[in-house]
């Protein structure tokens, strides 16, 4: 994946001076960005880390588990452009909240009702398609409130929060399973 970037004749973009930003300041600027990234890290790690375990416990074959997990990535690939397009034209906060509500509803339906495998694959595509772009939406939303020189520092803080949330996703999901 890095080869095209490394071989491109274009120089890396020049950044003006960057400034650090504390977690307290970052949270005061964008509580949605901070809390969203923490939750997104937990949800991503639970989804992608435990989906195959859930599939095995549910009696899916190895091939079905592979298709199920792969469908989440395909959904992210397919829906990232329409969601990005919508993000550039609507209130990002409302888009993040709306997509999160749809994802929660889809997860709830999937958890409560036994689904045929083909429907399960569709659900996985929808969940992957919605949850993967939320990561980028949260960064973009936070950056909307920052001066350019604080964006890199804020991104570092958001990535840290995402990673911190990722620690608890598979563990808490494993306990619930």
Language-model features, listed with the residues they occupy:
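C-terminal membrane-cytosol helix-exit motif in multi-pass small-molecule transporters
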Residues: 1-14
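Extracytoplasmic gate region of multi-pass secondary transporters
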Residues: 31-68
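Transmembrane alpha-helical segments of major facilitator superfamily
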Residues: 67-76, 158, 162
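Residue-level signature of mid-helix packing/kink "hotspots" within the transmembrane helices
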Residues: 73-81, 166-167
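Helix-to-loop junctions at the C-terminal end of transmembrane segments
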Residues: 78-91, 177
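Structural signature of the two symmetry-related core transmembrane helices
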Residues: 94-109
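Intracellular juxtamembrane helix-capping segments at the cytosolic ends
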Residues: 132-146
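A late C-terminal transmembrane helix in Major Facilitator Superfamily
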Residues: 149-177
């Amino acid at each position: 994946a890095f080869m095209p970037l490394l071989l491109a004749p274009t120089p890396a973009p020049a950044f003006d001076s960057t400034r650090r930003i504390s977690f307290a300041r970052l949270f005061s600027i964008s509580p949605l960005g901070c809390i969203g990234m923490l939750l997104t890290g937990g949800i991503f790690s639970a989804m992608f880390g435990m989906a195959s375990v859930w599939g095995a416990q549910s009696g899916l074959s190895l091939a079905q588990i592979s298709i199920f997990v792969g469908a989440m990535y395909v959904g992210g690939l397919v829906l990232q452009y329409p969601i990005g397009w919508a993000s550039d034209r609507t209130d990002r906060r409302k888009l993040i909240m709306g997509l999160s509500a749809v994802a929660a509803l889809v997860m709830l339906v999937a958890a409560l009702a036994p689904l045929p495998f083909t429907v399960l694959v569709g659900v996985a595509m929808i969940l992957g398609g919605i949850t993967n772009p939320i990561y980028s939406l949260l960064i973009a939303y936070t950056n909307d409130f920052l001066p350019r020189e604080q964006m890199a520092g804020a991104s570092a803080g958001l990535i840290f929060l995402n990673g911190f949330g990722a620690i608890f996703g598979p563990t808490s999901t494993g306990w619930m399973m």
